[in-house]
């Protein structure tokens, strides 16, 4: 059984701050899936800051609960049209997101943490997105198809 307890529109720090109540009690047969960083990049937070925070937190979490880290997909130009970012920031933001994804993948491998690379598995086509960043109904179905094989512990 899957139970979604997500935070949409949150930054990484918000996501990690919300975990304290969750981690205060034991959870059997639970896999914690976490994907974040895109909102931080869109807000202008430096990738090096995200990487330090993520590495510190996943090191702690990995000792408490089985993890699966989602590597975010890149953004499409629709995100400019819908107002999420400016045209001049689009290329830089996608480059930062790609570098952040490479960092996550390398560290998940080093730490033996399960990961799903949505940046390569998810189609980079506006047909799958509602706004160039967030999936639409068809996109969420595709996310679920990609993630399902990883969600058993």
Which stretches of residues belong to each language-model region?
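Short, small-residue-biased leader/transition segments that mark boundaries at the very start
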Residues: 1-2
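Histidine-bearing beta->alpha loop at or near hydrolase active sites
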Residues: 7-10
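Alpha-helical cap/lid subdomain in secreted, periplasmic
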Residues: 16-153
């Amino acid at each position: 059984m899957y139970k979604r307890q997500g935070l949409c529109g949150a930054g990484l720090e918000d996501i990690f701050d919300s975990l304290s109540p969750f981690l205060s009690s034991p959870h059997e047969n639970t896999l914690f899936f976490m994907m974040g960083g895109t909102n931080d990049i869109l807000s202008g937070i430096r990738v090096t800051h995200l990487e330090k925070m993520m590495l510190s937190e996943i090191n702690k979490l990995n000792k408490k609960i089985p993890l699966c880290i989602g590597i975010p997909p890149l953004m499409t130009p629709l995100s400019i049209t819908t107002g999420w970012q400016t045209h001049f920031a689009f290329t830089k933001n996608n480059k930062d997101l790609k570098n952040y994804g490479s960092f996550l993948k390398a560290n998940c491998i080093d730490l033996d943490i399960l990961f799903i690379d949505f940046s390569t598995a998810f189609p980079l086509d506006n047909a799958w997105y509602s706004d160039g960043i967030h999936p639409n109904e068809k996109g969420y179905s595709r996310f679920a198809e990609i993630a399902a094989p990883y969600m058993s512990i």
